[in-house]
Amino acid sequence: MTFSVKSPILGFEGIKNVEITKIDDFFVKMQDKDGDTSFTMINPYSLRNYEFDIPTYYQDLMQISDKSELQVYNMLVISSPIEESSVNFMAPIVCNTTNMTLSQVILDPVNYPQYSQAEKISTLLKKK
């Protein structure tokens, strides 16, 4: 699926269009359509209870309504073994599959103290 990036991906502000490809039930690959940059992301719901409110700014930017179909992913920093990889829960990638738009939503740490920028998968697996 190809998405138009409506809010820049931190550190990769030049990326305007991405292709998201499912790897398996847990992981997806996000590839810059106009370059060589790619990211591995994870379905956060496979690891933990993960809830947040999408700020109005992003809702307007992505034209999110009650009827919008959304998917949420989190960026991974891959390590070996995979359980040592870290997940950024503070900046989810929100995909509106209704209009094929995407934004990286930056969460306020004051409102979401339970999430961090670099939480190891192994820590999350122990909590389950």
UniProtKB/Swiss-Prot annotation:
Gene3D superfamilies: BH3618-like
Any GO CC annotation of this UniProt entry: cytoplasm
Annotated NCBIfam families: PRK13282.1
Subcellular location: Cytoplasm
Function: Acts as an anti-CsrA protein, binds CsrA and prevents it from repressing translation of its target genes, one of which is flagellin. Binds to flagellin and participates in the assembly of the flagellum.
Main location per the UniProt record: cytoplasm
First and last residue of the signal peptide: none
Pfam family for this entry, one: FliW
Gene source species: Campylobacter fetus subsp. fetus (strain 82-40)
Gene name tied to this protein: fliW
GO terms, biological process: bacterial-type flagellum assembly; regulation of translation
Key words, A-Z: Bacterial flagellum biogenesis, Chaperone, Cytoplasm, Translation regulation
UniProt protein name: Flagellar assembly factor FliW
Similarity-based family: Belongs to the FliW family.
InterPro entries assigned to the protein according to its UniProt record, in alphabetical order: Flagellar_assembly_factor_FliW, Flagellar_assmbl_FliW_dom_sf
